[in-house]
Amino acid sequence: MSQPITRENFDEWMIPVYAPAPFIPVRGEGSRLWDQQGKEYIDFAGGIAVNALGHAHPELREALNEQASKFWHTGNGYTNEPVLRLAKKLIDATFADRVFFCNSGAEANEAALKLARKFAHDRYGCHKSGIVAFKNAFHGRTLFTVSAGGQPAYSQDFAPLPPDIRHAAYNDINSASALIDDSTCAVIVEPIQGEGGVVPASNAFLHGLRELCDRHNALLIFDEVQTGVGRTGELYAYMHYGVTPDLLTTAKALGGGFPVGALLATEECASVMTVGTHGTTYGGNPLASAVAGKVLDLINTPEMLNGVKQRHDWFVERLNTVNHRCGLFSEIRGLGLLIGCVLNADYAGQAKQISQEAAKAGVMVLIAGGNVVRFAPALNVSEEEVTTGLDRFAAACEHFVSRGSS
């Protein structure tokens, strides 16, 4: 008989790069989770915007089990039917002509940045290598992507960092214009900065970046790892803005909880990549591809995407009610089901404490820095789950405020 597992085992056995909650979830269904003691939680964290269809969705389980009974992996020396079907679905649904599959958002962004450098080198010469990114962005944890992220706290311990990466102020087209020139190979931007505080880009900002990239022959990369696959009420957030990127990265919700990432590219951009220029052992794995294909089937429908917009209204209405009672937030912002509640000055820096109180009350939420409580629930979360979860969140907020004033 195996020994019981406890939260303390994490501190004993794991490299301490995370500080997980004091409870261990063991079972989930829809937007509910239960821990080892049987306590129920309403899940508004969604695995950090990953569990787009909740936990243990029956059609995703069926897709996974069906493929698992056939074969699991062959490597990139062979292709497979699920990955080709998935590629065609993404191409048909977006601007893209070609797809590269990998295992995570960081890998997708790494591939995009490498492709952009190679595209510029092949077309214009090695002098055209500059990458412009944005302060407070997050693009992953590889050395290249963490350098592009523009958050020194994540990169400062790993110098020397890759060169020729500069950071402009987000939503400031004049700041970006001062950095983008003929030596720039790419601009990478999140349509909504997720980890940076749930900050949506302005329409003028993204249109301005498209114009600057066209003027200077630079590729425009949209990092849609967090905003993609229905999260904002469109399949991808670029569709809200009417700005088409040259490259788009996607992951998180694409697998509905199964690890998968992808780089979407135009034919012109993809043409510079040849056999051996990039790759990954697990990319396009048939298990991941079978699940992701079913995720797209379920999410890319008018009913689901319109439902995300409706659920946004449920959340914002109820969060405003919570705020009227507690007075915690200066702003509630975001698109679709990526929502950030910005703490006012009296509670600055205490988002983590609020998330901990929420967990005690039986609801899981995220943070986006010290000042923003973030919600990224399942796209199919029910109205009952929203009501129950936000009632628990309200109780947590009231307890937090009363504790602070006592």
From Swiss-Prot:
Organism (species): Escherichia coli O7:K1 (strain IAI39 / ExPEC)
Entry keyword set: Aminotransferase, Arginine metabolism, Pyridoxal phosphate, Transferase
Family, similarity comment: Belongs to the class-III pyridoxal-phosphate-dependent aminotransferase family. AstC subfamily.
Residues found modified as N6-(pyridoxal phosphate)lysine: K252
Pathway it works in: Amino-acid degradation; L-arginine degradation via AST pathway; L-glutamate and succinate from L-arginine: step 3/5
Entry-linked InterPro entries: Ac/SucOrn_transaminase_bac, AcOrn/SuccOrn_fam, Aminotrans_3, Aminotrans_3_PPA_site, Class-III_PLP-dep_AT, PyrdxlP-dep_Trfase, PyrdxlP-dep_Trfase_major, PyrdxlP-dep_Trfase_small
Cofactor names: pyridoxal 5'-phosphate
Catalysed conversion reaction: N(2)-succinyl-L-ornithine + 2-oxoglutarate = N-succinyl-L-glutamate 5-semialdehyde + L-glutamate
EC number: 2.6.1.81
Functional description taken from the UniProt entry: Catalyzes the transamination of N(2)-succinylornithine and alpha-ketoglutarate into N(2)-succinylglutamate semialdehyde and glutamate. Can also act as an acetylornithine aminotransferase.
GO molecular function: identical protein binding; pyridoxal phosphate binding; succinylornithine transaminase activity
GO biological process: alpha-amino acid biosynthetic process; arginine catabolic process to glutamate; arginine catabolic process to succinate; ornithine catabolic process
Keyword Cell wall biogenesis/degradation attributed: no
Pfam family, one: Aminotran_3
Protein name: Succinylornithine transaminase
